[in-house]
């Protein structure tokens, strides 16, 4: 593998070589996970036991409840929703780590939904269906919010476009991906609007269907409406970066620029979160998940928390949202913060070529 990669690099096939390395990494990770937890993956999620243990724990700080979505789910089915793959170090090559001025005075509580109330996208709760597309949702939703905050334009960008068209550069689509790669993709390739390439069809089923699990959709590079051109619908990022893993830097980033994407480790008990400030109480480590962080505060019990929007529908959690302990790197949430700034090249104008010709020349 190493010799082949060296030869490929000398022939300028950098992206193909990187794809081989990432594919090999993911294959080894997948085999290890299957061998270590095959019995666990086929077992049922223990709703009764987990809900009881959390709610009877006086120090839990949060409440659990039965969730119909996971009523008859195996651990493997739950794991399909958790699409953050272990990110190869190569993905962070050249990615800056952003910190902020420590003299910036931050409020004790902050909610992006009220701070930028004109931006309706911030308060949207979506549903990723049975696809491990959380890495794409967290990125696309945060970038949509940032376009509104910076340019005063309400725009919903397409999760489906990123999921289908980023390919091996972002990971494996519905089988998981790398959050930072999504932000790098925005910078170099852009993403179309949801109107151009929707994630949900008109029956309410998740694209491409309502199966228990479904494959990554194909990249069409064509808007569903004949009145739009795919290239003209593109919106771009101007940067992609990691935020320094300190609560003050994360708060400053959200306060100045808007919601960010965060990745964290999910345990079985998280599936049953209902209210309060989450911290891991019981259950096995299931996988990595990505969501949108929109604010922070302190509970009545004095527990500092982050406020986040999940994409498991409003029937999950606290109307689709959850709070998690802040300042202790709970479940690794403060070590996986990525973001980027929107570009004023958000719409490419003056393109008169048909999408059919654009696809053939891409």
Curated annotation (Swiss-Prot):
Subcellular localization: Vacuole
Family to which the UniProt record says this protein belongs: Belongs to the peptidase C1 family.
Keyword Disulfide bond in record: yes
Tissue: Expressed in roots, leaves, stems and flowers.
Induction line: By dark-induced senescence. Induced by infection with an avirulent strain of the bacterial pathogen Pseudomonase syringae pv. tomato DC3000.
The protein's Enzyme Commission number: 3.4.22.-
UniProt source species: Arabidopsis thaliana (Mouse-ear cress)
Cystine crosslinks: 119-148, 131-174, 165-219, 166-170, 196-223, 205-210
One term under GO cellular component: extracellular region
Record PANTHER family: CYSTEINE PROTEASE FAMILY C1-RELATED
EC class: hydrolase
Keyword Zinc-finger included in the entry's annotation: no
One term of GO molecular function: cysteine-type endopeptidase activity
Propeptide stretch(es), residue numbers: 34-105, 346-362
Function: Thiol protease that plays a central role in plant programmed cell death (PCD). In addition to its role in protein degradation, may cleave and/or degrade a number of target proteins, activating signaling towards PCD. Contributes to the increase of caspase-3-like activity after UV-C-induced PCD and is required for abiotic stress-induced PCD. Functions redundantly with CATHB1 and CATHB3 in basal defense and distinct forms of plant programmed cell death (PCD). Participates in the establishment of basal resistance against the bacterial pathogen Pseudomonase syringae pv. tomato DC3000.
Keyword entries, A-Z: Disulfide bond, Glycoprotein, Hydrolase, Plant defense, Protease, Signal, Thiol protease, Vacuole
GO annotation, biological process: defense response; proteolysis
Active-site residue numbers: 134, 289, 310
Residues carrying a glycan: 35, 72, 154, 313
Organism lineage: Eukaryota, Viridiplantae, Streptophyta, Embryophyta, Tracheophyta
Annotated signal sequence range: 1-33
Major subcellular location class: other
Top-level taxon of origin: Eukaryota
Protein name: Cathepsin B-like protease 2
């Amino acid at each position: 593998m190493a010799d082949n990669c060296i030869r490929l690099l000398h022939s300028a096939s950098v992206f193909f070589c990187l794809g081989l390395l990432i594919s090999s990494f993911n294959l080894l990770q997948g085999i290890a996970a299957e061998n270590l937890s095959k019995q666990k993956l086929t077992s049922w999620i223990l709703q009764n036991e987990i809900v009881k243990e959390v709610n009877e724990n006086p120090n839990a700080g949060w409440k659990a409840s039965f969730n119909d979505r996971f009523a008859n789910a195996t651990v493997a089915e739950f794991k399909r929703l958790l699409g953050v793959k272990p990110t190869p170090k190569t993905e962070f090559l050249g990615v800056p780590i952003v910190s902020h001025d420590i003299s910036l005075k931050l409020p004790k509580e902050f909610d992006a939904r009220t701070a930028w109330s004109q931006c309706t996208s911030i308060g949207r709760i979506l549903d990723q269906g049975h696809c491990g597309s959380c890495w794409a949702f967290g990125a696309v939703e945060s970038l949509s919010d940032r376009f509104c905050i910076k340019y005063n334009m309400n725009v919903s960008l397409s999760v489906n476009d990123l999921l289908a068209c980023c390919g091996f550069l972002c990971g494996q689509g519905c089988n998981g991906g790398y959050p930072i790669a999504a932000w790098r993709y925005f910078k170099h390739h852009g993403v179309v609007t949801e109107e151009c390439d929707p994630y949900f069809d008109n029956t309410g089923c998740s694209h491409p269907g309502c199966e228990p699990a479904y494959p990554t959709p194909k990249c069409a590079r064509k808007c569903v409406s004949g009145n739009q051109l795919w290239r003209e619908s593109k919106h771009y990022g101007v940067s992609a970066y990691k935020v320094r893993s300190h609560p003050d830097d994360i708060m400053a980033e959200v306060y100045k620029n808007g919601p960010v994407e965060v990745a964290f480790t999910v345990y079985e008990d998280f599936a049953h979160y209902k209210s309060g400030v989450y911290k891991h109480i019981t259950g096995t480590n299931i996988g990595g998940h990505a969501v949108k962080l929109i604010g922070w505060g302190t509970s009545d019990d004095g527990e500092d928390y982050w406020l986040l929007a999940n994409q498991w529908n409003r029937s999950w959690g606290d109307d689709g949202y959850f709070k998690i302990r802040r300042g202790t790197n709970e479940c690794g949430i403060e070590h996986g913060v990525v973001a980027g700034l929107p570009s004023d090249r958000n719409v490419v104008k003056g393109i008169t070529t048909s999408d059919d010709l654009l696809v053939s020349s891409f």
